[in-house]
């Protein structure tokens, strides 16, 4: 609700960070959890948008307990789901700006003047990531359908034998 949204947004930066860190920690798959999972944004978005728009994670040293916890997120992902694939979905700054204007979000966070910086930060986080399985999808000149097809094709090399067997069983059904 709008009331709940305002309550969250009115929290101190420290409390917003604590809540978001808990949310990220909660959604990281644990070892042996089995099954498939999709994690969108997770700690990457938070590392980028937190300092830029929500006034947290600014000027924290790597040995700060908050950063030590946050820096362990990828180790947790690797421990719980070592086959995870990190996907960087990107588009040109102009394409993103046009899409934001053509289809505005009710509570748009990203500001048009920040797009180039945000793209650069996501690229930095992608390159720095410990996750070994990586894929880049550039949607600049592609429709949603074309981008999904590129994603499916790009994920192919990362499928485990079990994944391939499950896909085959769905095709036969």
Model-inferred region functions:
Residues 101-173:
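NTP-dependent small-molecule kinase module
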Residues 1:
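Short beta-strand-centered segment that lines the nucleotide-binding/catalytic pocket of NTP-utilizing
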Residues 43-46, 92-94, 141-144:
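Short, solvent-exposed loop/turn segments at secondary-structure junctions
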Residues 5-81:
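Glycine-rich phosphate-binding loop used to anchor ATP phosphates in small-molecule kinases
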Residues 49-125:
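A glycine- and Lys/Arg-enriched "phosphate-lid" helix/loop adjacent to the NTP-binding pocket
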Residues 37-38, 84-88, 134-136:
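Conserved beta-strand scaffold positions in the cores of enzyme catalytic domains, especially
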Residues 7, 40, 88-89, 139:
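Small/polar loops that bind or transfer phosphate-bearing groups
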């Amino acid at each position: 609700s709008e009331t709940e949204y305002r309550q969250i947004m009115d929290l101190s930066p420290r409390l917003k960070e604590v809540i978001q860190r808990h949310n990220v920690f909660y959604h990281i798959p644990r070892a042996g959890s089995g099954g498939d999972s999709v994690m969108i944004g997770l700690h990457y978005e938070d590392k980028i948008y937190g300092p830029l728009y929500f006034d947290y994670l600014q000027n924290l040293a790597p040995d700060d307990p908050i950063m030590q916890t946050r820096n362990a997120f990828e180790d947790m992902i690797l421990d719980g789901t070592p086959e995870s694939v990190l996907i960087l979905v990107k588009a040109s700054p102009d394409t993103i700006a046009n899409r934001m204007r053509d289809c505005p979000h009710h509570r748009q966070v990203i500001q048009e003047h920040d797009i180039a910086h945000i793209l650069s930060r996501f690229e930095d986080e992608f390159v720095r990531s410990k996750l070994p399985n990586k894929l880049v999808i550039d949607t600049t000149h592609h429709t949603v359908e074309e981008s999904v097809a590129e994603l499916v094709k790009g994920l192919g090399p990362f499928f485990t034998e079990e994944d391939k067997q499950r896909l085959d069983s769905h095709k036969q059904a």
